[in-house]
Regions:
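Active-site-adjacent helical/loop segments in soluble small-molecule enzymes
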Residues: 72-141
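Glycine-rich phosphate/pyrophosphate-binding loop at beta-loop-alpha junctions
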Residues: 1-82, 136-170
């Protein structure tokens, strides 16, 4: 199985829905589970600091609309709080270039029509690779196997085309 799994967190339902059965099936063999949020709506990180589900005031929207929630669900909190090994917040800076990379098939496995939220895990992975201290903290090594969860395709075809075009120029 994967040594690392990057899970996008909005209200936490999808991440909890993945973690719970994987934990049941794999138990102690479960790899590192890493939550990923937009820094503009990092309600899980805020909840970790407060040690209780907390509301985040969203003053600016992220391109990753599906992650722009501002509040973790109580049920997701009960599952994710003890299950996630790490949680990272990301900016929107890499979204367009990574969407273009998926669209052009540069990551292997062919072309993928990946929407904005689908880049969250890869955005966090790339950021970790650029930060040696974070890379070490996340315990990556030469035999690491990473699972990235993509959550949507081109839900807004016009925005998708715009971001892929912008991403190809970066």
């Amino acid at each position: 199985g994967p040594s690392h799994c990057f899970l996008p967190i909005g209200v936490g339902g999808l991440a909890a829905g993945i973690v719970a059965p994987v934990w049941q099936h794999m138990g102690a063999n479960l790899g590192k589970m890493i939550g990923v949020e937009s820094y503009m709506s990092a309600c899980f990180l805020e909840s970790i600091d407060a040690q209780t589900p907390s509301l985040v005031d969203i003053s600016e929207e992220t391109l990753m609309a599906g992650l722009s929630c501002g509040e973790i669900s109580d049920l997701a909190w009960q599952i994710l709080q003890p299950s996630l090994d790490h949680c990272l917040s990301i900016t929107d800076d890499a979204i367009a270039p990574l969407m273009a990379g998926f669209a052009d098939g540069v990551f292997g496995g062919g072309r993928i029509e990946a929407g904005e939220c689908s880049t969250a895990g890869l955005t966090a992975l790339v950021a970790a690779k650029k930060d040696p201290a974070l890379w070490e903290k996340l315990e990556f090594g030469p035999t690491s196997v990473v699972l990235l969860i993509g959550t949507e395709g081109a839900t807004d075809p016009g925005l998708y085309d715009q971001l892929v075009t912008e991403g190809r120029q970066k």
